[in-house]
Amino acid sequence: MPVPGRFDKLFRRIEQYRDEMVDLQMRLCAIPAIAPSSGGEGEAKKADFLAEWLKDNGFVDVSLIKAPDLDAPDGYRPNGLAYFRGKSSARTTWIMTHTDVVPPGEMSLWKGHPFKAWVEKGKVFGRGVEDNQQDMVASLFAVKALRAEGIEPNCDIGIALVADEETGSRKGIDYVLQNHKVFRRQDLIVVPDAGNEHGTMIEVAEKSILWLKFKTIGKQAHGSTPEKGINSFKAASFFIAALNDLYKIYPAKDKLFDPPISTFEPTKKEANVPNVNTIPGEDVFFMDSRILPQVEVRDVEKTIQKIAAGIERKFKVKIHAEVQQKALAAPPTSAEAPVVQALKKAVRTVYGKDAKAMGIGGGTVAAVFRRAGFPAACWSKLDETAHQPNEYCIIDNMIGDAKVYGHIFLQE
């Protein structure tokens, strides 16, 4: 545990940086870092700005790992790395955040300009201010406070500012892990890519994801003579109802997750015929399944095929299934892993709450680390406004999270 006096000094220094932290948020927000595939120019300008900031504020070995991308104006996507050296280099404590942001969406839904951040009632508003700049700024100022107080951490601190998180990470942390030996098994790796409003969730595991598109093909006919057609919509509706049996077929529970079960939900529905008096000959819907790690995804797919075959026989239709996304659950990080225990200690000290290791249904970039054998943990204190119009960061969360990182940096 950190010496109370050093920790108190660090706390006070971080609090003094409140205005500077908000200012950095606003400057970062003014540099849209949208992926080329989403209509943007990528993260190069933002990465260059951050590299200069890091050098000006005492970080060393600042570098950019450039993932080739011909769609980006500069031909690459930048992944920034920087260090603050401690007493020992035997281990590095990493905070990894991402520099890219999603597009603002419908502009009319914003109260202000999404890339001209504004402050209102203790919050910074703008695209990217919570996802992921809140904890990016928090981690940077935790280190800046250490330097200002002349406190040397026990081990090295690493800051990773990666690209392409919002569109798959192939040009981001995936590329870094595949092409460079940056991380080590003994390192502590914190990824602020998930959290809750209380700061009590440490994400250590994820469910498998299976998104399927189903096209049901029947025979179109006039609405007054349904016997001359085969109603694809009706067959698809019975199919959807039959798919609900997946909950009974796969009833396993795991208390690590919330909800503790596998979920199988029909979601998107495409329009079929445009008029009321036509029996549709084709119908399309999608299903989003989040499957517990102990359940074999391939087994679920086979069960769905059997259910579809039954509907085909009963209604004389054809059902085509197409995988939209399939991601098998990564090996979980142990709830006893050093990074989890470090976060628990820090959260208890800073927020006065008992955080616990949990699993979630959605995918996080920490899964990339876990598949590579690194026990990463996701944590942050968020209001979960990411990707929404009027996205905001609660300034007190940014300050508090900086203290959490500072606490971890000073732990033995």
Residues covered by each model-derived region:
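Metal-dependent amide/peptide-bond hydrolase catalytic core
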Residues: 1-9, 16, 33, 71, ...
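Acidic/His- and Gly-rich active-site-bordering loop/insert found
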Residues: 2-125, 148-153
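A structural signal for isolated positions on well-ordered beta-strands in alpha/beta enzyme cores
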Residues: 63, 94, 158-160, 320
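Short, solvent-exposed loop/turn segments at the edges of secondary structure
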Residues: 77, 112, 154, 185, ...
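Structural motif
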Residues: 91-94, 123, 158, 187-189, ...
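Short beta-strand segments
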Residues: 96-98, 160-162, 190-193, 217, ...
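Glycine/serine-rich anion-binding loops at beta->alpha junctions
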Residues: 122-137, 222
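Acidic/histidine-rich catalytic neighborhood of metal-dependent amide-processing enzymes
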Residues: 130-205
